[in-house]
C-alpha cells in the first residue's frame, strides 16, 4: 500500500513518500485499522468484504473514521448531536468495534513527553540529534495545542489506520473519481462538523481564511487540531491485472 495525505479540494493529488530503507521494520496494520474498498471491472464495489452501492460509501467511510472501539465520536452542532446515532458494527465474539480503536491523547501524558524531549534536546551533542529531538518535540507541542483548542483530552486514530482503495485495470475512470470523491467527502464533512462546533466555521472556511492570511498562527492551529482528529489517509493498491469480479 502507498499511503498519501490529501488536504486539497482542487482535484485528486498524490505525493508519494520516499522508499522505506531496507533495515527499517514496517509494522503491519491490523485488519480492523484498514477500511478496504475494491472496485471491479463492472464498476461494482466491495467494501469491507461485502457489496455496497456507491451512494452508501460516504456514510460507511464515516463510520470507519468515527469508530472509537468503545463508542462514537460525537460533536454537538447547534441543537443536534452529530454522530450519536450512527451505526457501528461490533464483533460478536470480542465485543469490540470492527473498526479502529481510537487512542487517548491526554494532557498529562503530553506534558510529560514535552518535558522529556526538552531534556533530550538540551543534552543533545550533535546537530542530527538536535534536529530529530526538535521534530518530535514539535509534534508533542502540536498535540498540546490541539488539546487546548478542543477543550480537553481527545482520541486519535492509530497511525496504521487508513482507507485502502483498489480498482481493476478495467474500472472506468468516472467510477474511480466517484469513489475518490465519496471518500474525500466523508473526511471533509466530519472535519466541517468538528470545526463548526469548536471554532464556529467549517473546515473549508478555515482553510480559505488561512490561504488569505498565511501568517495567522491561530488559524493554522485550528486547522491542525481538526486534522488531528480526522486525518485523511487514503492509500491505493496496485490495480488488479485483467478483468475480475473482485
Predicted regions and their residues:
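Long, low-hydrophobicity, acidic/polar, solvent-exposed interaction domains
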Residues: 4-246
